[in-house]
Amino acid sequence: MKKTGILNSHLAKLADDLGHTDQVCIGDLGLPVPNGIPKIDLSLTSGVPSFQEVLDIYLENILVEKVILAEEIKEANPDQLSRLLAKLDNSVSIEYVSHDHLKQMTQDVKAVIRTGENTPYSNIILQSGVII
């Protein structure tokens, strides 16, 4: 039995299978998941697990070269944005798009991880980097 890292087998496999430029989305309770895109639903109840908890685990286990966020988070959820930005390495590129465009972009991700987060625009697309 694995005792460190990502213990959830679905999340671990997703992280293990990511190649350079592959994308994965971590989303709040309300983010729609396009047909055909795998959804890993971690939500237990409203707020559990939080967006930040899931993001922390993924940032510890994958190399991220770019993140994509909804422009609307800047005004609608600045506390969430501040905490999120504080976790990113200086080398990570940040792109802001409209929330509608971010939802369209989820059609190309490897999977959407649904959290119990109940605050607005708590969604991120992580683009995998390369270690060489």
Curated annotation (Swiss-Prot):
One GO cellular component term: cytosol
Molecular function GO terms recorded: D-ribose pyranase activity; intramolecular lyase activity; monosaccharide binding
A Pfam family this chain is assigned to: RbsD_FucU
Residue positions binding substrate: 28, 99, 121-123
Keywords of the record: Carbohydrate metabolism, Cytoplasm, Isomerase
Keyword Isomerase annotated: yes
Active-site residues, Swiss-Prot/TrEMBL: 20
Metabolic or biological pathway, per its Swiss-Prot or TrEMBL entry: Carbohydrate metabolism; D-ribose degradation; D-ribose 5-phosphate from beta-D-ribopyranose: step 1/2
General function of this protein: Catalyzes the interconversion of beta-pyran and beta-furan forms of D-ribose.
NCBIfam families named in the record: PRK11797.1
Name by which UniProt lists this protein: D-ribose pyranase
Species of origin: Streptococcus agalactiae serotype Ia (strain ATCC 27591 / A909 / CDC SS700)
